[in-house]
């Protein structure tokens, strides 16, 4: 068997149904599906049973241990030459498996990954979040874009790897967030050939509201410091940009407030030079933020053919950059300054 598609799932039977439905339309048929139920209260076993006559599908239920360990559980039971790791909230185009096969035939790889896109049926908020998570303006192209500021690391929403390599590297670590980047780093360190398959893309639903999106990106910022503590060389300039943006926005607001406060209080004559300098610097920072916002709006509106999504993309981008930046700064203080151990946030409310 060529492919084993491994999907960890937690309380997402509807998403699993949609994913399995799209798998019935794949032109390539040499695959099995391994669904690992990670302690769900709303299981998808009945959904899986409906597809047993359409594909080779295996359903396993286990106690909750997180997505990384659930993928390992599935990999230990998989039979395919290649393991395809997917999130439950992705949908595959009909030619997905063929695109993977074509790339492997053209240039073999030990591990690989593909980009993600927003489906036309997604909500405007999902499309805005998808834009923010894939745009060069917000990610530096490190998530599979054509322009990039760092090499491509496969992500667990759309990732493939030879089964023998997966087992040799012991799969995913027990990190709660950032476990896919941790695995990709170890893949590179082992000297494996790792590639981006640009045509093996998926539709990725992502978070459905900005509150959940904040929790996700806040933990991503924490995970980057956790990864830095394990692999200091993995921290690149592009990973610092959200933190710089966050501090820049906060700094601009403070400069504007304290720069114009003397004018509002009628005390500008006390420290005129300092007040004017702070106000001027604040205005320069504000101008930069406005220009960046306009660029986001124009680019997203053009890409999504929607002014509304363009406006929502501004909120999504600021949520992503400042959420990541705040998580990054929090983890830097706790781990690098205070010397605390690895941690994550919103553990009890992450999915709510």
Protein language model features and the residues they cover:
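Short, acidic, metal-binding catalytic loop of nucleotide-sugar glycosyltransferases
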Residues: 21-30
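A conserved acidic beta->alpha catalytic loop
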Residues: 22, 37-46, 64-65, 87-93
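Acidic donor-binding/catalytic loop of UDP-sugar-dependent glycosyltransferases
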Residues: 42-43, 90-103, 185
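Glycine-rich, basic loop-to-helix element that forms the pyrophosphate-binding segment
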Residues: 62-78, 99, 153-156
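Short aromatic/hydrophobic "clamp" motif used to bind/position activated sugar donors
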Residues: 83
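Conserved donor NDP-sugar-binding/catalytic core segment of glycosyltransferases
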Residues: 94-127, 205
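Catalytic donor/gating beta->alpha subdomain of glycosyltransferases that bind UDP-sugars
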Residues: 173-235
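Membrane-embedded multi-pass helical conduit in multi-pass membrane proteins
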Residues: 245-337
């Amino acid at each position: 068997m060529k492919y084993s598609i491994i999907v960890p799932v937690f309380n997402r039977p509807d998403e699993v149904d949609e994913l399995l439905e799209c798998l019935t339309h794949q032109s390539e048929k040499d695959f099995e599906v391994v669904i690992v139920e990670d302690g769900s209260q709303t299981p998808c076993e009945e959904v899986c049973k409906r597809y047993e006559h359409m594909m080779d599908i295996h359903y396993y239920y286990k106690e909750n241990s997180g997505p990384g360990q659930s993928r390992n559980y599935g990999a230990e039971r998989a039979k395919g030459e290649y393991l395809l790791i997917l999130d439950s909230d992705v949908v595959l185009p009909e030619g997905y498996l063929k695109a993977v096969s074509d790339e492997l035939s053209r240039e073999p790889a030990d591990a690989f990954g593909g980009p993600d896109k927003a489906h036309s049926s997604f909500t405007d908020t999902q499309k805005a979040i998808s834009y923010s998570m894939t745009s060069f303006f917000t990610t530096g192209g490190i998530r599979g874009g054509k322009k990039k500021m760092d090499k491509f690391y496969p992500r667990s929403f759309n990732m493939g790897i030879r089964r023998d390599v997966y087992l040799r590297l012991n799969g995913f670590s027990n990190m709660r967030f950032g476990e896919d980047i941790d695995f990709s780093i170890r893949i590179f360190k082992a000297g494996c050939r790792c590639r981006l398959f640009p045509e093996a893309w998926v539709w990725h639903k992502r978070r459905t509201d900005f509150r959940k999106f904040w929790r996700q990106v806040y933990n991503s910022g924490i995970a980057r410091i956790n990864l830095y503590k394990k692999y200091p060389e993995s921290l690149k300039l592009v990973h610092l940009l959200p933190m710089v943006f966050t501090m820049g926005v906060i700094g601009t607001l403070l400069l504007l407030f304290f720069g114009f406060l003397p004018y509002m209080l009628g005390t500008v004559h006390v420290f005129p030079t300092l007040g004017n300098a702070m106000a001027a610097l604040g205005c320069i920072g504000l101008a930069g933020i406005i220009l960046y916002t306009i660029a986001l709006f124009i680019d997203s509106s053009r890409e999504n053919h929607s002014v509304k999504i363009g406006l929502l993309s501004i909120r999504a981008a600021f949520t992503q950059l400042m959420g990541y930046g705040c998580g990054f700064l929090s983890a830097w203080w706790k781990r690098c300054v205070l010397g605390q151990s690895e941690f994550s946030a919103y553990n009890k409310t992450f999915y709510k």
